[in-house]
Amino acid sequence: MIEMKDVSKWYGTVQVLNNCTTAIEKGEVVVVCGPSGSGKSTLIKTINALEPFQKGQIFVDGQAVHDPKTDLPKLRSRVGMVFQNFELFPHLSVTENLTLAQIKVKGRTAEEAKTHGLKYLDRVGLMLHKD
């Protein structure tokens, strides 16, 4: 279960989340819709502790995402999300882009992440583009 209680976030003086409160049950699928700049991506990133927030509380399966003791890679593995646009880093190679999330979100070592990434590149016939 995901639970948000009065979550607010600002970028400087601009408030992008205003006292957001909701509960999402395990297995429930939620689509976040709205116009450009309405805070959709910020909301999703905040739930996954990829973006800090200034006020309120967020819990995933009873664990507070803002608690420094929370195992964030484990927490993130329990919340599925699909972004509208991929956020790739143009200064990184294809392999580096593939491994970054595995290291940061799944907690894999760089070597484990590279092994997995190369396996999937090979599977889809893109090994020539790995560098």
PLM region spans:
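Short coil-to-beta microelement around the adenine-binding A-loop and adjacent beta1/P-loop entry
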Residues: 14-15, 73
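ABC ATPase NBD coupling module
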Residues: 65-80, 110-111
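Conserved ABC ATPase "signature" region
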Residues: 63-64, 99, 110-129
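Short coil-to-helix segment of the ABC ATPase nucleotide-binding domain corresponding to the Q-loop/switch region
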Residues: 91-101
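The feature captures the beta-strand-to-loop junction immediately N-terminal to the Walker
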Residues: 33-35
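ATP-binding/catalytic-site motifs of ATP-hydrolyzing domains
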Residues: 57-59, 63
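Helix-to-loop junction immediately C-terminal to a conserved catalytic motif
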Residues: 48
